[in-house]
Swiss-Prot record:
One of its GO terms (cellular component) is haptoglobin-hemoglobin complex. The gene is HBB. Belongs to the globin family. The lineage of its organism: Eukaryota, Metazoa, Chordata, Craniata, Vertebrata. In a single animal, two types of beta chains were obtained from hemoglobin I having the alpha-1 B chain variant. Red blood cells. This is Hemoglobin subunit beta. The modification N-acetylvaline is found at V2.
């Protein structure tokens, strides 16, 4: 559960209304794979990840990034039940994929960077604080199966 105040919900939802999940999702996942290259081992089937340009231009990275970012939209609709919303994804990432749960935090932080880059004027310190709360809540929900 993420407790966002009314103004925090407004900040998050207003910005979310301008997010292009295809563009920003691909960028966020791509940046994760470039900045934290050891995370690439989970995406070996995606083809060429040999350089930053290859990662950022990879169609499979972009498509999966859009899918990942779409799940943040689900989070916004289910702030009171993030653990339930992400239960199946948590189980998949824990039991089948064996993803280090710290990678969820990393992705959340990369997403905040991407949002700041694209929405610099709207991404006020207050908006950043609200988004940090949201990505932390999503990260915690995704890591739930690990506990």
């Amino acid at each position: 559960m993420v407790h966002l105040s009314g103004s925090e919900k407004t900040a998050v939802t207003n910005l979310w209304g301008h997010v292009n999940v295809n563009e920003l999702g691909g960028e966020a996942l791509g940046r994760l794979l470039v900045v934290y290259p050891w995370t690439q081992r989970f995406f070996e089937s995606f083809g060429d990840l040999s350089s930053a340009d290859a990662v950022m231009g990879n169609a499979k990275v972009k498509a999966h990034g859009a899918k990942v970012l779409t799940s943040f939209g689900d989070a916004l609709k289910n702030l009171d039940n993030l653990k339930g919303t992400f239960a199946k994804l948590s189980e998949l990432h824990c039991d089948k994929l064996h993803v280090d749960p710290e990678n969820f935090n990393r992705l959340g932080n990369v997403l905040v960077v991407v949002l700041a880059r694209h929405f610099s004027k709207e991404f006020t310190p207050e908006a950043q604080a609200a988004w940090q709360k949201l990505v932390s809540g999503v990260s915690h929900a995704l890591a739930h199966k690990y506990h």
